[in-house]
Amino acid sequence: MFVTLIKPLARLHPRAWDFVQLVRLDRPIGIYLLLWPTLWSLWIAAGGVPELKNLLIFVLGVTLMRAAGCVINDFADRDFDGHVARTKARPLATGKISVREAWITFTILVALSFGLVLLTNAPTIWLSFGAVAVASLYPFMKRYTYYPQVVLGAAYSWGILMAFTAERGELPASAWLLFLANVLWTVAYDSYYAMTDREDDLKIGIKSTAILFGDADRLIIGSLQGLTLLLLALAGNRFELGACFYLGLVVAAACFAWEAWSTRDRDPQACFRAFLHNHWAGLAIFLGTVADYALR
């Protein structure tokens, strides 16, 4: 449905769709995976429905920063993407968009995001610098470490910290449980994603947890997902959440079980579907959180 809504953008200018693809608006899964944990945290930090201003800031901010992350990722990978079946048609890899145009796009997106952050408070503004730094660092880690997914996890979890400071003006220690849970979850689902490209990555020297885990990949992913649920349950206890929140965790656990079963043969397409499926786990936890506060 999201792609259907943005399709008319292709008619605005002959090159409009190239930029849509550059910022991955045609593939909104990254927005969802970044948005749900941020929304969990906004609701928990607010003790219910957050301020409308903060809700709008974070929804727009997530969308803009995910887009900026895609641009810097494609810049970093522009010499590799042409050798990977899944990424060879990306606009920077094909030359449809120049490096200069990509940098201009990245700068505009970050500037717009920072403009939104300026509407919050000082602690959130200071945290935003870390968000940009970690998001910019991630794409280059694939050259040097088998743990780029951990850096991605930190980038995808930074909104959790900012949500608390925006709502409360401070960062409670218990927020780090949510942060760590989301880092582990991100490593898990992005390992499924990396499994789809594992053979190509081995040929061109790109590192990932999928390569590091080897034949133990599914076992380790399942363990990471289990730890994610445990940490979320601990966070739920610390923030005095109730049955609806834990029901959301049960639904997420069912999603994780389906992913483990569906990838039993390690088929690349099945691994990609498992990656996409994590959106439903995040949504279930969000709905459980919302329901828990709404029914009090």
From Swiss-Prot:
Cofactors: Mg(2+)
Alphabetical list of Gene3D superfamilies matching this protein: UbiA prenyltransferase
EC number: 2.5.1.39
Pfam families named in the record: UbiA
Principal location class: membrane
Pathway entry: Cofactor biosynthesis; ubiquinone biosynthesis
Cellular-component GO terms for this entry: plasma membrane
Membrane topology: Multi-pass membrane protein
InterPro entries linked to this entry: HB_polyprenyltransferase-like, Prenyltransferase, UbiA_prenyltransferase, UbiA_prenylTrfase_CS, UbiA_sf
Record GO biological process: ubiquinone biosynthetic process
Regions that span the bilayer: 29-49, 55-75, 102-122, 146-166, 169-189, 219-239, 241-261, 275-295
Keyword Transmembrane helix carried by entry: yes
Alphabetic keyword roster: Cell inner membrane, Cell membrane, Magnesium, Membrane, Transferase, Transmembrane, Transmembrane helix, Ubiquinone biosynthesis
GO MF, any single term: 4-hydroxybenzoate polyprenyltransferase activity
Subcellular location: Cell inner membrane
Catalyzed reactions per annotation: all-trans-octaprenyl diphosphate + 4-hydroxybenzoate = 4-hydroxy-3-(all-trans-octaprenyl)benzoate + diphosphate
Matching CDD domains: PT_UbiA_COQ2
NCBIfam families documented for this protein: ubiA_proteo (TIGR01474)
Described purpose of this protein according to its UniProt entry: Catalyzes the prenylation of para-hydroxybenzoate (PHB) with an all-trans polyprenyl group. Mediates the second step in the final reaction sequence of ubiquinone-8 (UQ-8) biosynthesis, which is the condensation of the polyisoprenoid side chain with PHB, generating the first membrane-bound Q intermediate 3-octaprenyl-4-hydroxybenzoate.
Family: Belongs to the UbiA prenyltransferase family.
HAMAP family: UbiA
Name of the featured protein: 4-hydroxybenzoate octaprenyltransferase
Organism per entry: Pseudomonas paraeruginosa (strain DSM 24068 / PA7) (Pseudomonas aeruginosa (strain PA7))
